[in-house]
């Protein structure tokens, strides 16, 4: 879920999680157009993963609680999750790891989606 995604970001990243809430065309609520960079692409992939969870697993990914471990920047989804919980956990895990390795461009924070996301 979104709260756990925030905590996963905190586990893998030195940058504050708020930096990812309104970045590019896909990081934050909604998303459209072409991702502006690699980090924005991470968010687009995460959005698509959540869409798949909704349609294939029939669950609400933004509200689904799952079990995971964070140790020294490493994230592990626990084995005791249901199929849906495991799917959502892996969506969030993949996004957090992607955020950690993608370059952050300050000019893409809080861009105007009506101008930059066509």
UniProtKB/Swiss-Prot annotation:
Cofactor note: Binds 1 Ca(2+) ion.
Main location: secreted
Cellular component terms (Gene Ontology): extracellular region
Disulfide topology: 11-70, 25-117, 27-43, 42-98, 49-91, 59-84, 77-89
Tissues with expression: Expressed by the venom gland.
Reaction(s) this enzyme catalyzes, per UniProt: a 1,2-diacyl-sn-glycero-3-phosphocholine + H2O = a 1-acyl-sn-glycero-3-phosphocholine + a fatty acid + H(+)
Keyword Lipid metabolism among UniProt keywords: yes
Requisite cofactors: Ca(2+)
Keywords of the record: Calcium, Disulfide bond, Hydrolase, Lipid degradation, Lipid metabolism, Metal-binding, Myotoxin, Secreted, Toxin
Annotated InterPro entries: PLipase_A2, PLipase_A2_Asp_AS, PLipase_A2_dom, PLipase_A2_dom_sf, PLipase_A2_His_AS
Annotated positions binding Ca(2+): 26, 28, 30, 47
A GO molecular function held by the record: calcium ion binding
SUPFAM superfamilies reported for this sequence: Phospholipase A2, PLA2
Domain of life (superkingdom): Eukaryota
Family: Belongs to the phospholipase A2 family. Group I subfamily. D49 sub-subfamily.
Functional note: Snake venom phospholipase A2 (PLA2) that has only a weak enzymatic activity. It has a myotoxic activity in vivo (dystrophic effect). PLA2 catalyzes the calcium-dependent hydrolysis of the 2-acyl groups in 3-sn-phosphoglycerides.
Protein name, entry field: Basic phospholipase A2 nigroxin A
Native organism: Micrurus nigrocinctus (Central American coral snake)
């Amino acid at each position: 879920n979104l709260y756990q995604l925030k905590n996963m970001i905190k586990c893998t990243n030195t940058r504050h999680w708020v930096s990812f809430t309104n970045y590019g065309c896909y990081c934050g609520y909604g998303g459209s157009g072409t991702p502006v960079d690699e980090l924005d692409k991470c968010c687009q992939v995460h959005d698509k993963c959540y869409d798949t969870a909704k349609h294939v697993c029939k669950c609400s990914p933004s509200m689904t609680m799952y079990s995971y471990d964070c140790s020294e920047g490493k994230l592990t989804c626990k084995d005791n999750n249901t199929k849906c919980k495991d799917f959502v956990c892996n969506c969030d895990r993949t996004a957090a790891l992607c955020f950690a390795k993608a370059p952050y461009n300050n000019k893409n924070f809080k861009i105007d989606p009506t101008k930059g996301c066509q």
